[in-house]
Amino acid sequence: MSLVYLLIAILVIMAMILLMSKRRALAKYAGYIALVAPVISSIYFLIQIPSVAKLQYLSTSIPWIKTLDINLDLRLDGLSLMFSLIISLIGIAVFFYATQYLSSRKDNLPRFYFYLTLFMFSMIGIVLSDNTILMYIFWELTSVSSFLLISYWYNNGDSQFGAIQSFMITVFGGLALLVGFIMLYIMTGTNNITEILGQADHIKNHGLFIPMIFMFLLGAFTKSAQFPFHIWLPRAMAAPTPVSAYLHSATMVKAGIFLLLRFTPLLGLSNMYVYIVTFVGLITMLFGSITALKQWDLKGILAYSTISQLGMIMAMVGIGGGYAQHQQDAIASIYVFVLFGALFHLMNHAIFKCALFMGVGILDHEAGSRDIRILSGMRQLFPKMNLVMTIAALSMAGVPFLNGFLSKEMFLDALTQTGQLSQFSLISMIAIVFVGVIASVFTFTYALYMVKEVFWTKYDSKVFTKKNIHEPWLFSLPSLILMVLVPVIFFVPNIFGKGIIVLALRAVSGGNHQIDQLAPHVSQWHGFNIPLLLTIIIILLGSVLAIKVDWKKVFTGKIRQISVSKSYEMVYRHFEKFATKRFKRVMQDRLNQYIIMTLGIFMIIIGYGYIRIGLPKVHQLHVSEFGALEIILAIVTVTIGISLIFIRQRLTMVILNGVIGFVVTLFFIAMKAPDLALTQLVVETITTILFIVSFSRLPNVPRSNANKKREIIKISVSLLMALIVVSLIFITQQTDGLSSISDFYLKADKLTGGKNIVNAILGDFRALDTLFEGLVLIITGLGIYTLLNYQDRRGQDERE
């Protein structure tokens, strides 16, 4: 089955979900219909593993906009396969979990599952895209669907603010990424990603190479919540927990990492890229791990822990990026080891973090709180979640016999080997190891502290008063399955390592198939070495800090108020107030004022152009022949126009304005343009009648006395606008050096297959204009239909 058919199948499921929104009886089954999408995609991608392992990559290319090299290019290699499996398999767990989390009585289920399926469709589109512009479209679709999901409970102020904040930051990064893609097109002449990576040696010597890297980093850092763009992720926790488990831990936040991995053969050619990604990742890891200890909300803790873990993966992606420069060197195996560790921990993090979010969601759903100051001794009430969250948290902390231990060991090993790499000095290595170890200590601390406070403290019935707590099996099933995978991966890591991660490494290395020999064999025991010593130190220090320190009392007062997010909110509120004041000053419900402002800005732009190039010179002016009729019509038009300034009765003004329109109709007839005359006549008649009918239903309020200052402004704007129009006519008559667009239409008319030049212009040459005009009519019709339908429902409700 083609990759396109898979995407079409997901779109069909989305359409079915939308249809269910019309039938309340069917709406409650929307989740199970939506569940088909990740199941189908999971089966599809699992079947493709043997083919990808044999280097039989699946690709599809459908021409779209050939002149701009924008095509529907899709490609399934090892990297896209790994990410697609994570998106699809985690999707099954999350979609099923959501069917138990949401209520068909309180929630609009079709709307939620449509948004969630749209997000899954967009993420799969990102990882399969082999065209930069296509990737950008899917990239922004994830931002849009994330916005819709975060704001799903739109009556909640936190949901609204979180959705807006995440949308603004991620779209800003997306626009920067688009600029980077355009730079790549300028440098290579193609938008095809495979072809771009094949020109890496040419691109690195181009003047736009470094600016392009910065654009890519902005896109990746904003999407993957790297410092200082991390602030949107904690606010996004206002979304329903299934959204947090899927988007904000396992998939969307990994899109930035995917971007850098996909372009590693190109970006890694710059040492600057290696430095920036490595140190930004480590700073983010340290910042996230410390800030997590400040949180009282369990989802807040997990949000900052996600930021920290993403920083850890990003640091490994940065260090491993140097492989692009040293593929044939003896140290190539170190880079491959680091990249393998990044991919391994990316997979591990998706599993244990999704399980943690699901556990928090069950606690919130059943206990009614996520506050660790209220939740205590929950192991008695939630034994299954105690097991799930404890194992998942310890895996995140890097405790032995769990999958997180293996990837954390690889991370520490990678840090200690940076001294052997040409990009890092001994001092850099010491700083990297120090920051990585300190961040890991705090990671262990918040992971252990979280489960200790929620499950292993004494149950206090005075603080937690809710009764009749239960822990449904179906609700717990997805998190239990993910929990089982945590120790399973520890004992059989190479099933995933050799079967999936090595395939992804081939793509990250730029198609170097010899990387199979360089890829590490994951072992549970490497003997007593420096990474193991560091792990022991981390566990001992982290245990002491988690057990002996009451972190709820440490971050209090002014220390707690220090926050990058609060600084963003302060700036945002300031600009919001500033914009509101300006808006109220400008938008005063006066149409003539809006027209004056619009024309004024237009005149400023034209005036600036005249200042730069000089006023148009009048020479060889061609004046059309005119007779007495044209002179009379012109005098009538000018006379009526001047009289409108002094007339105070609105109805008289409307009638005279209509007369001007009819005079223009006579002008068209005199100029032998009957089609334009007929159009003008119909439009002018309808608008005049509508005006008169509207005024007949409005109170007879006389027009206010003229304000001399305002009238002078109006007359001045009108005269200046008239002069500009006349000057533009002069300019167009003197552009003899340029070919006329009308000549092009006449010569190319036969190519369209049309028999009428007007039809050819509307249907071919100006097809987009016609399309958008049609869309305007459709949207207007939908608006009218909605209003009428609303009135019908309202009347029916009143009768009932």
Curated annotation (Swiss-Prot):
<feature type="transmembrane region" description="Helical">
    <location>
        <begin position="712"/>
        <end position="732"/>
    </location>
</feature>
<keyword id="KW-0050">Antiport</keyword>
<dbReference type="InterPro" id="IPR001516">
    <property type="entry name" value="Proton_antipo_N"/>
</dbReference>
<comment type="similarity">
    <text>Belongs to the CPA3 antiporters (TC 2.A.63) subunit A family.</text>
</comment>
<dbReference type="GO" id="GO:0015297">
    <property type="term" value="F:antiporter activity"/>
</dbReference>
<feature type="transmembrane region" description="Helical">
    <location>
        <begin position="627"/>
        <end position="647"/>
    </location>
</feature>
<dbReference type="GO" id="GO:0005886">
    <property type="term" value="C:plasma membrane"/>
</dbReference>
<feature type="transmembrane region" description="Helical">
    <location>
        <begin position="424"/>
        <end position="444"/>
    </location>
</feature>
<feature type="transmembrane region" description="Helical">
    <location>
        <begin position="472"/>
        <end position="492"/>
    </location>
</feature>
<feature type="transmembrane region" description="Helical">
    <location>
        <begin position="241"/>
        <end position="261"/>
    </location>
</feature>
<feature type="transmembrane region" description="Helical">
    <location>
        <begin position="273"/>
        <end position="293"/>
    </location>
</feature>
<feature type="transmembrane region" description="Helical">
    <location>
        <begin position="118"/>
        <end position="138"/>
    </location>
</feature>
<feature type="transmembrane region" description="Helical">
    <location>
        <begin position="651"/>
        <end position="671"/>
    </location>
</feature>
<dbReference type="InterPro" id="IPR050616">
    <property type="entry name" value="CPA3_Na-H_Antiporter_A"/>
</dbReference>
<feature type="transmembrane region" description="Helical">
    <location>
        <begin position="527"/>
        <end position="547"/>
    </location>
</feature>
<feature type="transmembrane region" description="Helical">
    <location>
        <begin position="676"/>
        <end position="696"/>
    </location>
</feature>
<feature type="transmembrane region" description="Helical">
    <location>
        <begin position="1"/>
        <end position="21"/>
    </location>
</feature>
<dbReference type="Pfam" id="PF13244">
    <property type="entry name" value="MbhD"/>
</dbReference>
<feature type="transmembrane region" description="Helical">
    <location>
        <begin position="167"/>
        <end position="187"/>
    </location>
</feature>
<dbReference type="InterPro" id="IPR025383">
    <property type="entry name" value="MrpA_C/MbhD"/>
</dbReference>
<dbReference type="GO" id="GO:0006811">
    <property type="term" value="P:monoatomic ion transport"/>
</dbReference>
<feature type="transmembrane region" description="Helical">
    <location>
        <begin position="207"/>
        <end position="227"/>
    </location>
</feature>
<dbReference type="InterPro" id="IPR046806">
    <property type="entry name" value="MrpA_C/MbhE"/>
</dbReference>
<comment type="subunit">
    <text>May form a heterooligomeric complex that consists of seven subunits: mnhA2, mnhB2, mnhC2, mnhD2, mnhE2, mnhF2 and mnhG2.</text>
</comment>
<feature type="transmembrane region" description="Helical">
    <location>
        <begin position="331"/>
        <end position="351"/>
    </location>
</feature>
<keyword id="KW-0472">Membrane</keyword>
<comment type="function">
    <text>Expression of the mnh2 operon in E.coli is not able to catalyze Na(+)Li(+)/H(+) antiport. It does however confer higher growth rates than the control strain at up to pH 9.5. The operon may encode an NADH-ubiquinone oxidoreductase.</text>
</comment>
<keyword id="KW-0812">Transmembrane</keyword>
<feature type="transmembrane region" description="Helical">
    <location>
        <begin position="768"/>
        <end position="788"/>
    </location>
</feature>
<dbReference type="InterPro" id="IPR001750">
    <property type="entry name" value="ND/Mrp_TM"/>
</dbReference>
<feature type="transmembrane region" description="Helical">
    <location>
        <begin position="387"/>
        <end position="407"/>
    </location>
</feature>
<feature type="transmembrane region" description="Helical">
    <location>
        <begin position="595"/>
        <end position="615"/>
    </location>
</feature>
<keyword id="KW-0813">Transport</keyword>
<dbReference type="Pfam" id="PF00662">
    <property type="entry name" value="Proton_antipo_N"/>
</dbReference>
<dbReference type="Pfam" id="PF00361">
    <property type="entry name" value="Proton_antipo_M"/>
</dbReference>
<feature type="transmembrane region" description="Helical">
    <location>
        <begin position="33"/>
        <end position="53"/>
    </location>
</feature>
<keyword id="KW-1133">Transmembrane helix</keyword>
<keyword id="KW-1003">Cell membrane</keyword>
<keyword id="KW-0406">Ion transport</keyword>
<protein>
    <recommendedName>
        <fullName>Putative antiporter subunit mnhA2</fullName>
    </recommendedName>
</protein>
<feature type="transmembrane region" description="Helical">
    <location>
        <begin position="78"/>
        <end position="98"/>
    </location>
</feature>
<feature type="transmembrane region" description="Helical">
    <location>
        <begin position="300"/>
        <end position="320"/>
    </location>
</feature>
